[in-house]
Amino acid sequence: SFARSQGLLAMEAMWTRYLPQSTILRALLESGDLGQPELFAAQFCTDNRAVKRLWTTVGGGTLFDMGIYTLAMAQQILGNPSTISSSGIVGAHGIEQELSVSLGYESGARAHLLISGIATLPQVASCSFEKAQVSLHAPFFVPSAITIGTKDFYPDETTWKDTTGIQGHEGLAYQATWFADYVAQGLVESPVHPHEDVVATLRVMEEILESLSTT
């Protein structure tokens, strides 16, 4: 609100939403060709025990550093959940090490997220829609690829891959480009990731931690 009152652009550094595969996904969602989303699944599981910032009592934990990417992708596809439940492993000083999160939506759609800072699994995100299935290749939160397929057991598939040579965290450059364009337009928030989305995701994460503490 302060940035808005000053006429300044404020954006969260949720760079995954500005990657090419996310732009393609957004276009598919807006077209309506996929139908309504049914079931979303994503996992961000990497043995990050050597990354000290994750395990500090101030700002530590896997949810805010890693899990936010799964939640932001779920939000892009499904919106904000109406029900939240979680379970997991809590380590020293009450810092979450691993979480399994289930989200329910008023539409009837479901999302299941797996986040771990102690185990490693492929970092993929997929969603079943009424008319198709969509998969974001690992690691889904950096420049990668997107596959759209039929819902058959052996689906017909079409894949787009980022061939720019931009890899890993170099993908931050995509959001920087969008940011520069928004500044030139005089915007105060991102149309593809508005402030209300940022705040909503933070609230969901707080509820996840509350749910975890009571299980």
What does each model-found stretch correspond to?
Residues 16-85, 92, 215:
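Predominantly a Rossmann-like dinucleotide-binding segment in NAD(P)-dependent oxidoreductases
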Residues 7-9, 36, 107-109:
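Short, well-ordered coil/turn segments that N-cap beta-strands
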Residues 72-145, 171-173, 177-187:
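Contiguous beta-strand/loop segments that form the cofactor/metal-binding neighborhood of enzyme cores
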Residues 52-59, 154-162:
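Short glycine/proline- and charge-enriched loop/turn segments
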Residues 163-177, 193:
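Active-site loop of classical SDR/Rossmann-like NAD(P)-dependent oxidoreductases
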Residues 1-14:
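Beta-strand-loop-alpha-helix segment that lines the small-molecule cofactor/substrate pocket
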Residues 106, 178-215:
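C-terminal helix-rich "cap/oligomerization" subdomain common to oxidoreductases
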Residues 20, 24-27, 73, 100, ...:
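Alpha-helical elements of Rossmann-like donor-binding domains used by nucleotide-donor carbohydrate transfer enzymes
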